[in-house]
A protein has these predicted regions:
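Alpha-helical transmembrane segments in multi-pass membrane proteins
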Residues: 1-48, 102-105
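Helix-to-loop transition at the C-terminal end of transmembrane segments
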Residues: 4-9, 81-97
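Structural signal for the C-terminal ends of transmembrane alpha-helices
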Residues: 41-51, 154, 200-203
Length: 238
């Protein structure tokens, strides 16, 4: 529940969640990873999770890397189709075209200082430490832990062979609510991303596969943001 509560608490704030300096990002990563390691480690110890329950028994193979890239592309295409379809339905319901497209995009500037991405060192941190560790590893461990926990708490619903797939739904919703600062379009998009990443986790029964796909998805987003900012000036920090 904590990611959702933190996301809701930041709704409407103007500053980006990620600091706009290299030092700030390193400090934030250190604090966040330390707190998460302590909290997740304690929870895993109390719950006595097995490695298999967290999908940590499948090693990374060389083909895991290109496959993760392919999954990240598929996720991006899928989310694009979801948003485009939602736009079409909204226009059909309204009976007229929606001209204010800025209101129909995730507010990524609430997560990261887009102007700071012009700094090569800052961008490098986003593409590596933030994408694959702070976001990828941490959030996929959280997802695997939540699925395992739901299976323990409600085995009739979330246990057995298909239960973890049903558990993806509430876990993805919590994941989306953790991105509330991006607006409700961002919540919908990240909920869809959460479903996709959870499906990768369960399909391959491999946490590393999901971490890599998550990391490549985020890294591509950060790499494209400076270019997109030239097309959408509102992305630039005030």
């Amino acid at each position: 529940m904590l990611p959702a509560l933190l996301g809701l608490s930041r709704e409407g704030t103007d500053s980006a969640i990620l600091p706009g300096t290299v030092r700030g990002v390193l400090l934030l990563c250190g604090i966040e990873l330390t707190l998460f390691t302590a909290a997740f480690g304690l929870a895993a110890w109390l719950a006595r999770f097995r490695w298999a329950e967290l999908y940590l028994t499948t090693p990374i193979r060389w083909w895991s890397w290109p496959r993760a890239i392919a999954w990240s592309i598929a996720l991006r295409v899928g989310i694009g189709m979801l948003l485009a379809g939602s736009l079409g339905v909204a226009q059909l319901v309204r009976g007229k075209p929606i001209t204010d497209l800025d209101s129909l995009r995730p507010k990524v500037e609430a997560m990261v200082d887009v102007a700071a991405l012009q700094d090569p060192l800052y961008l490098a941190l986003m593409l590596t430490l933030v994408s694959f560790v702070l976001a990828g590893l941490r959030e996929e461990l959280w997802r695997a832990g939540m699925i395992a926990l739901l299976g323990r708490l409600a085995p009739g619903w979330f246990g057995g062979r298909w239960g973890p797939w049903f558990a993806l739904i509430p876990v993805a919703i919590l994941f989306g609510l953790g991105h509330t600062p991006q607006g409700w379009v961002g919540v919908a998009a990240t909920t869809g991303i959460g479903l996709g990443l959870g499906a990768i986790l369960l399909f391959h029964r491999s946490l590393p596969e999901a971490v890599l796909a998550h990391g490549f998805f985020n890294a591509t987003t950060f790499a494209l943001l400076p270019w997109i900012a030239h097309l959408i000036p509102k992305l630039q920090a005030p």
